[in-house]
A protein has these predicted regions:
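N-terminal low-complexity segments that are often proline-rich with Ser/Thr-Pro
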Residues: 1-10
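Zn2+-dependent metallopeptidase catalytic domains
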Residues: 9-170
Length: 170
């Protein structure tokens, strides 16, 4: 029945979106079905958007911890799902997996653009970046901050809205 399939789908999404209770935390491939991926990607994007929104809406002044570190740890679920799926797509693909990849790729591109071109998020990153000399960051933190700032800049965060829209269209 539909309810039964919905329940099973939620269990499968759970398998992909939660930490794996397996030796070495490896993906339980025998329990993952191709039809589980699209809803899992949708859930992963939803969770990642919520994490980004929490960073953007944080009323506290931007700091390394509440902006750069939080950004570095955001999207873990989506990253895990993507790693599993795209490794399967590369190593053991079939027509169904390729079809899913065609459906998922635009969703991931749109999400990536929404993050990289988010003016409020970039403003927080830029604020921290401009204060980097005063923050007493260690080498690893300095590298992370530099990479995050440059990634936003190189991916269009400094563009005008018209140019950002042109970039999204590509």
């Amino acid at each position: 029945t539909f309810k039964h399939k919905l329940f099973l789908s939620k269990i499968q999404i759970s398998i992909l979106t939660h930490h794996f209770n397996t030796k070495h935390n490896t993906a339980p491939f025998s329990k993952i079905k191709n039809e589980d991926f699209l809803p899992a990607f949708q859930k992963g994007i939803e969770l990642a958007k919520a994490e980004i929104d929490a960073i953007v809406r944080n009323p506290i002044k931007p700091t390394f911890e509440n902006t750069i570190e939080a950004l570095a740890f955001s999207g873990d679920v989506l990253d895990r799902i993507s790693s599993i799926f795209f490794n399967l797509n590369s190593a053991e693909t079939d027509d169904e997996i390729q079809k899913i990849a065609q459906e998922v790729s635009p969703l991931l591109s749109e999400f990536g653009n929404d993050v990289r071109l988010n003016p409020d998020l970039f403003a927080r990153v830029k604020t921290v970046y401009e204060q980097r000399e005063k923050l007493n960051l260690n080498a690893e933190q300095t590298t992370l901050l530099d990479k995050k700032y440059k990634s936003f800049s190189r991916n269009g965060a400094n563009l005008s809205e018209d140019k950002k829209n042109q970039l999204r269209a590509i």
